[in-house]
Curated annotation (Swiss-Prot):
It is found in: Secreted. Its main location: secreted. Disulfide bonds join 28-55, 35-54, 71-107. This is Putative lipid-binding protein AIR1B. Pfam families: Hydrophob_seed. The keyword Repeat does not apply. The keyword Disulfide bond applies. Belongs to the plant LTP family. PEARLI1 subfamily. Keywords: Disulfide bond, Secreted, Signal. The gene is AIR1B. The lineage of its organism: Eukaryota, Viridiplantae, Streptophyta, Embryophyta, Tracheophyta. It comes from the Eukaryota. InterPro entries: Bifun_inhib/LTP/seed_sf, Bifunc_inhib/LTP/seed_store, Hydrophob_seed_dom, Plant_LTP/defense-related. Residues 1-23 form the signal peptide. Gene3D superfamilies: Plant lipid-transfer and hydrophobic proteins.
Amino acid sequence: MAPRTSLALFVSLNLLFFTCTSATTGTCPIQISTCANVLNLVDLTLGNPPVKPCCSLIQGLADLEAAACLCTALKASILGIVNINLPINLSVLLNVCSRNAPKGFQCA
């Protein structure tokens, strides 16, 4: 009877501890407008645009999540830009942040 009690206690403690943990998931930030400087669409500067603020916004996201987040932001015109080329701008933002769009991903 002791092994059953020990097993039941072990399983109960495992269930208790594993239900208390949570998975980390990234979220698409609203402050994506900081990426406008990367595209040189808001602040036209010579040289390299500041990429750190933009890339830090999508840092915790997987490549697919980052691409979807930036695509959604570009389509929603959060950047406040009327004429944008979605595939090119998305590619520029992902490349600057050392990210890749998943194969077959289309921002349309």
